[in-house]
Amino acid sequence: MAYEASLIEKKWQKIWDENEYFEPKDDLNLPKKYILSMFPYPSGRIHMGHVRNYTIGDALARYYRKIGFNVLHPIGFDSFGMPAENAAIKHKIHPKSWTYENIAYMKKELFSLGFSFSKKRMLATSDPLYTKFEQEFFIKMFEKGLIYTKEANVNWCEQDQTVLANEQVEDGKCWRCGHEVVQKKMPGYYVKITAYAEELLKDLEELKDKWPNQVLTMQENWIGKSEGLEFSLNLDEESKQKTKESSLEVFTTRADTIYGVSYIALAPEHKIVQNLLSQNLLNQDVLNKIKAIQNQSPRERQSSEKEGYFLGIYAIHPLSGEKIPLWVANFVLADYGSGAVMAVPAHDERDFEFATKYNLAIKQVIQTQENLPYTQKSGKLIHSQEFDNLDCNEARLKIISQFEAKNIGKRVVNFKIRDWGVSRQRYWGAPIPMIKCQSCGIVPQKLENLPITLPEDVQITGEGNPLDKHPTWKNCICPKCGKEAQKESDTLDTFFESSWYFARFASDEKTWQEKALDEKSVKYWMSVDQYIGGIEHAILHLLYARFFQKALRDLGYLTQNEPFDRLLTQGMVLKDGAKMSKSKGNVVDPDEIIEKYGADTARLFILFAAPPAKELEWNDDAVEGAYRFICKLYDRAQNVKKGELVELKQENLNKEEKYARLKVYEALKKSFEVYHQSFAFNTLIAACMEALNALALCKNEALEQEAFYIILNILEPIIPHVCFELSEELFKCKNFKKLELKEEIFVKDTLNLAVSINGKKRAEFEISSSASKEEILAFAKENTAKWLEGKSIVKEIYVEGKLVNLVIK
């Protein structure tokens, strides 16, 4: 009977569905595994990147179910966001309709691949019930001071008419639509992620060896802890009069280089710069250039060519008394440190580049024979008055102590990470559950009024926020004073939704109506044992999710410190050397692959083509090869003896049979390492192929039965439909249990040894594994007699189980 993928796959998907095979068990005393792949945005169709992500997670989930774990393997949809509004404009369809139609289609696609997701715990973040508890979290965080309002410069996308977080600006453009981003001053809500900066940094230690080093480094750099000196510099008298300021604060991590300061660089937003601008003390050209810098995102400022302008004012060096010119510069950020940088060109590459460009003084204060800038934090100080000849570290500590003693400076810790702006001026998002009252100011909604849902009678035009234009939706009564008030019309950044969905999945779905998170369930299931997703989420989603876990812990919802125990970042799927995209015309439709070859072929190719963490190059021939392997497996299974296994005795097998059995058990041994540790599915599949090839040379019915029993177990998480089908035919599915290694199979009857003479290989021979060292050496000499003739052996070396080396002269 020929292999018919479609019939087999539909049959088993129906059986699994009817028997709720993949729902987590209610018994919370069982050992558990929570396997989670990052959920998709419902764009309309899944792509090969999704297939790869979910195949990896599904293989792990199926494996752990098979060996007796209670497995939670959920899926949902990150369903709020700007693309739905863009689609509404383009296709004249409501964002909600577009979103839920896409979800319905993508659900069919996902289950057609045999993914073992829990259907009962499926959710969309745009569901009112999800919004309700998200709004509850927002209010609780607001009441605790973890969310606040302020007016600040924000990244503004003119195309999408919304605010973007720093992390959502890529090369000066919107990460979603690619449009230019400008700076705009606006009021908004901010999440105080900086309150957890120290803990977020410290707890990265817990994730070492469990998360990719690259992700840990990216997060460490983004948090950006630096310890240093914050100190005051007085302005000279003329500058005081111009700026209406008497001094400015500066932060430095290199107090040891303070005598090398040749200029102070200020952010364009610094109060001193703004005072000069307000008094028209800068010419129009400088004014225009400062405004241009202000329109750059923080990331652009850091990466673009260094630019600056002398402000015509001076500060006084606090120790030497020298006058230091003040410049405005594009590389200084207003919200890092004090928005002012002490520049030491001799010992900092950026400062050196700037000083060279504008012909500013370069003062060396650390002794070195190397070319400047010398940026190492080691060496003896020079030109530093009483601190000369001290090494850098000692000088740094003494200089800080002197500043503290004079009460003009102090030790401080700074972080690069900024508070997270979550206000978005768009319709298709979770409404911010706050009220603006003329009498009371900003007031939270009452919890019993949640969820605050979106009105459906809106016009999506792409111009401004539709909620602002709605005739009645904003109108409400202030819960504090009872007067007329207005709802907040901004909606939440969609990263707010994806920052806690994993905890919602961990809650028993029977409690979803009553509470955000079920204490008993989340205590059992959290943290996620294995999280799988792209490296592109290293900073955005993964950092926000870590913050949410800690904030919800402190609010009493969760108990764990970290949301994800282990993290796997899978590589991209490429075709013709480039990431698949419609614009490049290199997209492969998963539906077409399933229709032509079946889901198991797609799954097998995805896991065999490359290790999960590496990029995967799509190859049509390799897909054909995966299909042929499954056909071959199916065809050969038709000749395997059905029923109970016959016990094999190792001593009764011939050489070829022992070798084939060894290859089968080597594959089994590898499966334990792959499923538990390395996820190198490609090597496991290769080991199974090798075992089947060795088995083809044998004519032992009982051995073939045992081999298929084991190999179907190994491959079931990877190609489940065909393995369930064959296991039902051959073993009535009784093989789905934990398999154990038989160590006697790994004991070899014979050894294959190499013989070297003076380090050069001369012969190979086979000998019984029970042979003594003396017998092995004698056999080695016999096999190399022609090279030993007329020579004397001065040394005999035997490396057990590997080789013999004879040293002659």
Curated annotation (Swiss-Prot):
Pfam families xrefs: Anticodon_1, tRNA-synt_1_2, tRNA-synt_1g
Catalytic activity from the UniProt record: tRNA(Leu) + L-leucine + ATP = L-leucyl-tRNA(Leu) + AMP + diphosphate
Short sequence motif 'KMSKS' region: positions: 579-583
Gene Ontology cellular-component terms listed: cytosol
EC number: 6.1.1.4
Classification via PROSITE patterns: AA_TRNA_LIGASE_I
Swiss-Prot/TrEMBL keywords: Aminoacyl-tRNA synthetase, ATP-binding, Cytoplasm, Ligase, Nucleotide-binding, Protein biosynthesis
Compartments reported by the entry: Cytoplasm
Biological process per Gene Ontology, one example term: leucyl-tRNA aminoacylation
Stored InterPro entries: aa-tRNA-synth_I_CS (IPR001412), Leu-tRNA-ligase (IPR002302), Leu_tRNA-synth_edit (IPR025709), M/V/L/I-tRNA-synth_anticd-bd (IPR013155), Methionyl/Leucyl_tRNA_Synth (IPR015413), Rossmann-like_a/b/a_fold (IPR014729), tRNAsynth_Ia_anticodon-bd (IPR009080), Val/Leu/Ile-tRNA-synth_edit (IPR009008)
Main location: cytoplasm
A molecular-function term among this protein's GO annotations: leucine-tRNA ligase activity
Class of the enzyme per the UniProt entry, highest EC level: ligase
SUPFAM superfamilies the UniProt entry points to: Anticodon-binding domain of a subclass of class I aminoacyl-tRNA synthetases, Nucleotidylyl transferase, ValRS/IleRS/LeuRS editing domain
UniProt-annotated binding residues for ATP: K582
Motif 'HIGH' region positions after renumbering to this chain: 40-50
UniProt similarity note: Belongs to the class-I aminoacyl-tRNA synthetase family.
Name recorded for this polypeptide: Leucine--tRNA ligase
Source species: Campylobacter jejuni subsp. jejuni serotype O:6 (strain 81116 / NCTC 11828)
